[in-house]
Design a protein with these regions (language model features):
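Canonical leucine-rich repeat
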Residues: 85-88, 107-112, 131, 152-154, ...
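Alpha-helix boundary/capping motif
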Residues: 229, 239-240, 246, 255, ...
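Consensus "Asn ladder" position of solenoid repeat domains
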Residues: 80, 102-105, 126, 147, ...
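Ankyrin-repeat and related helical/solenoid repeat scaffolds used for protein-protein interactions
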Residues: 171, 176-213
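N-terminal capping/linker segments that flank leucine-rich repeat
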Residues: 17, 25-105, 116, 137, ...
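Short, low-complexity, intrinsically disordered N-terminal modules
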Residues: 4-5, 22-24, 150, 229, ...
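Bacterial Sec-dependent N-terminal signal peptides
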Residues: 1-32
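Conserved hydrophobic beta-strand positions in leucine-rich repeat
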Residues: 75, 97-100, 119-123, 142-144, ...
Length: 279
């Protein structure tokens, strides 16, 4: 017959359960606290903090609050020696962020996922290994060229139209949640396959420097495609699609261009495969 535990053992057991539950809960992702106008902005980089304080401390008290910077719509840190933009989330009304570095910047990580109003992001020429932009439903232009990115999450970016990510270390790009994308420059990466069929308005793709890349697209959606000599292009279109080379086109169709007005797909020195009914 089972006997009940002595009172002290019961207390110890409940304490252990509480500790276990506490550990379990601590692993869950905690949402950041809501910001008010009185929230003090804290920056992870002295140069970044000094710039913001010097520029936006309106009452001169040496403290920067969200109320003082919430209406800032554009920030330009091009060619400034800033190593971290931690604290950028305090700029809740930010629409444009420029932190390009022509001489090679120092940013290794950039998270703008809490800047919900952001429309334009230019962060080329840094040392970025991580760029967090997913979920920005107003973001339309991203230039993150010449960094060290091995992955780029493009989830939930419904109005993104322009993506420049050449000269990184990317192996894959998923465009399933970027239906408005019109221009892609992903040259000089390590991408082996590119599926742009979810992008109904695509007009330009620059993809040179990705050896053996296979592109999947609907030719009727792509009036201009610039590729490389070792690219395989898979085209899904109607059965009357005509293939021509530059000589036949008389120079109107240029090398590496898919021209909708001529109903012709031209990729000189490339393998061109047409799979009826889709790819």
């Amino acid at each position: 017959m089972c006997q009940s535990l002595p009172p002290m053992k019961k207390i110890s057991l409940f304490c252990m359960l509480g500790l276990l539950l506490g550990v379990s809960c601590s692993k869950e992702k905690v949402k950041p606290p809501a910001m008010t106008d009185d929230t003090v902005a804290v920056f992870g980089d002295d140069a970044f903090g000094a710039f913001c304080l010097r520029t936006y401390d309106r009452n001169g008290d040496g403290v920067l609050t969200v109320g003082e910077i919430k209406n800032v719509v554009s920030l330009d840190f091009d060619d400034k020696d800033i190593r971290s933009l931690d604290g950028i989330e305090y700029f809740t009304g930010l629409q444009s962020l420029y932190c390009n570095q022509s001489a090679g910047g120092n940013l290794v990580r950039l998270d703008v996922s809490r800047n919900a109003e952001l429309r334009t992001l230019c962060c080329a020429g840094n040392k970025l290994e991580e760029l967090v932009v997913d979920g920005l439903r107003n973001l339309s232009r991203v230039d993150c060229a010449a960094n060290n990115l091995e992955k780029l999450d493009l989830q939930n970016l419904p109005v993104l139209t322009f993506l420049l990510c050449r000269n990184n270390r990317l192996c894959n790009l998923d465009f399933s949640e970027t239906p408005g994308l019109k221009s892609i420059d992903c040259a000089n990466n390590g991408i082996s396959a590119l599926d742009v069929r979810p992008c109904g308005d695509i007009t330009m793709i620059w993809c040179e420097g990705n050896a053996g890349m296979r592109i999947s697209l609907d030719w009727r959606q792509a009036p201009g495609i610039f590729g490389d000599d070792d690219v395989v292009l898979e085209v899904a279109g109607d059965e009357n699609l005509v293939f021509a080379d530059a000589a036949v086109a008389g120079g109107v169709v240029q090398r590496g261009v898919l021209r909708d007005d001529l109903h012709a797909a031209v990729l000189l020195h490339m393998v061109l495969s047409l799979q009826r009914g889709g790819v």
